[in-house]
Amino acid sequence: MTVAAPAKVQYEAVIGLEVHCQLSTRSKIFSSSATAFGAPPNTQIDPICMGLPGTLPVLNEKVLEYAVKAGLALNCTIAPYSKFDRKQYFYPDLPKNYQISQYDLPIATHGWIEIQLSDGRTKRIGITRLHMEEDAGKLVHAGSDRLSGSSYSLVDFNRAGVPLIEIVSEPDIRSGEEAAEYVQELRRILRYAGLCDGNLQEGSLRCDVNISVRPLGSQTFGTKVEIKNMNSFNAIQRAIEYEFNRQVKAVEAGERIVQETRLWEENSQRTISMRKKEGSSDYRYFPEPDLPPIRVTEAQKTRWQAELPELPGVKRRRYQEVYGLSVYDARYLSDERNTAEYFEAVIAAGADPKAAANWMMSDIASYLNTHKLDYPDIALKPETLAELIGLIEQGTISSKIAKEILPELLEKGGSARALVEAKGMTQISDSALLGQMIAEVLAENPEQLQQYRGGKTKLFGYFVGQLMKKTQGRADPKLANDLLKQHLDG
């Protein structure tokens, strides 16, 4: 009697993300010190953010406004009443030895965003909560990128007290791709709303991953592991893929997953153990006694909601439904607010949406990438691009001529029509004149003409090239082809 081998267990990842976003305010959350990135160490500090005795925090009103706007943009319920709490822990970059955060009454809860995956599917990811807190300082390690292995460490307190919102997702994410797209969509939304610049390299947007594995179909959560130190979207995806495989191998080998914090090492493309993961009880939260409770009125919510721009998800759908753009084109053009605003200005100036999209996604995108520029940096105004597209549609110039003059318009601006006229580049659409030029081309190439009329019709392209050369590329392509065909076959 034979016994069939048991089927191999399939596992799935259960992933939740904690995304910390520095708000784009000019001053810190509880004091007036500046928040600019890149200032010399310890030049943007004050007694409050350094936790000196006798100082009292005062909430920056702009932080509350930005936090509520973020909650509204993420479809959250805004709490009419919330409060700050002290989160106790000891680390060199935390001068007070506690962080002012929010624990049981956050400013926003129960939100969601939709992400779009590479296979075209959309998925809704829930947001558990959004809360305000202050950032810590930054440790700079000599001789290593972390404390282990460094000869000594210095502390830059410029970042201490910079306002943060922490956005905690539901454990709805199942892959590295979904996680990376979720963070990218969060970044798009916050950048559109002008709340955070979303620069991962500068640390203004930081993501911690909580991941566990379980048999596919199981409803029981496994032991979660936290991953830190990912400073790109690709790093988030790779770290999750590595950690998922590590945990599956450990489970299959009968090992116990330890609840811990692990560090993503970019050079070795692996996670390494950093420390035991703390629980909320380890932080000994209690209400912040130096700050009053926060109240958000309906009037404030209504005003701040009205100040939000059209967000990228809504814009993508509108581009597809109103302008007939593809999913890819709509996504590209709505990805950054500067791009979307330029595109809409071109359309407002009278350009065909699909033609505007084609120019922006090809020649202009190539120019921007080559010169590391953005739309506000170029001299080509939206009205001029619309004018250029109009000249092509009117038959005044060909697409080839438009591509030739585009670099000058991008660098110097000005009128497309005036430039075409100054250079004498208007399209030749006179049938009689083109017919005369075609006759000259045929007379200059008797051997090729004889071969063509002898059956070698592939030479048609040769004659097109000769005609374009004679007209300096100014011949109306369709008219030129039709007339050339008539002369060759006549």
Swiss-Prot record:
UniProt catalytic activity: L-glutamyl-tRNA(Gln) + L-glutamine + ATP + H2O = L-glutaminyl-tRNA(Gln) + L-glutamate + ADP + phosphate + H(+); L-aspartyl-tRNA(Asn) + L-glutamine + ATP + H2O = L-asparaginyl-tRNA(Asn) + L-glutamate + ADP + phosphate + 2 H(+)
Molecular function GO labels: asparaginyl-tRNA synthase (glutamine-hydrolyzing) activity; ATP binding; glutaminyl-tRNA synthase (glutamine-hydrolyzing) activity
Q: Name the domain of life.
A: Bacteria
Per its UniProt record, what InterPro entries does this chain match?
Asn/Gln-tRNA_amidoTrfase_suB/E, Asn/Gln-tRNA_Trfase_suB/E_cat, Asn/Gln_amidotransferase, Asn/Gln_tRNA_amidoTrase-B-like, GatB, GatB_C_1, GatB_Yqey_C_2, Gln-tRNA_amidoTrfase_suB_CS
Question: What does the record list as GO biological process?
Answer: glutaminyl-tRNAGln biosynthesis via transamidation; translation
Which Gene3D superfamilies does the record associate with it?
1.10.10.410, GatB domain, N-terminal subdomain
Any one Pfam family here would be GatB_Yqey
What keywords is this UniProt entry annotated with? ATP-binding, Ligase, Nucleotide-binding, Protein biosynthesis
The EC designation for this entry is: 6.3.5.-
This protein's assembly is summarised as: Heterotrimer of A, B and C subunits.
Similarity field: Belongs to the GatB/GatE family. GatB subfamily.
Report the protein's function. Allows the formation of correctly charged Asn-tRNA(Asn) or Gln-tRNA(Gln) through the transamidation of misacylated Asp-tRNA(Asn) or Glu-tRNA(Gln) in organisms which lack either or both of asparaginyl-tRNA or glutaminyl-tRNA synthetases. The reaction takes place in the presence of glutamine and ATP through an activated phospho-Asp-tRNA(Asn) or phospho-Glu-tRNA(Gln).
Q: What is this protein called?
A: Aspartyl/glutamyl-tRNA(Asn/Gln) amidotransferase subunit B
Q: Which organism is it from?
A: Synechococcus sp. (strain JA-2-3B'a(2-13))
